[in-house]
Amino acid sequence: MLWNNKTSAKNTSSTDKGQVTESYAQQYLSKQGLRFIERNFHSRQGEIDLIMLDGDTYVFVEVKYRKSKGFGGAIAAISASKQNKVKHCITFYLHQNGLNEYNTPCRVDVVALEGDITQPQVTWLKNAF
């Protein structure tokens, strides 16, 4: 088990589940060699769950959790609208931090978590959109 959490999914609010799954994803990616930069970056356009570095590449991570794979599971829950919001938010982040979107290496990854919230199955999609 990557992360020990005794929280029951039944008594966990949506906000708490988001924090739990984002922590899990952050730890998972750190173990894969990525370096943590920031969590829950907000702009008027939306939110970026995690910002990590993979070498010199900025990795903007969307974390999704679903208890079951019904209705397509966690990956299918990322709509075209959500993707556009994330892309606009990335542009804002880069400009706010003095980075040029045209010559700053970056990508968008998805970490999809499914099943028991205390030991979810992890799917990591690099360059997801």
From Swiss-Prot:
One of its GO terms (molecular function) is nucleic acid binding. Pfam families: UPF0102 (PF02021). CDD domains: PoNe_Nuclease (cd20736). It comes from the Bacteria. HAMAP family: UPF0102. Belongs to the UPF0102 family. This is UPF0102 protein CPS_4433. The lineage of its organism: Bacteria, Pseudomonadati, Pseudomonadota, Gammaproteobacteria, Alteromonadales.
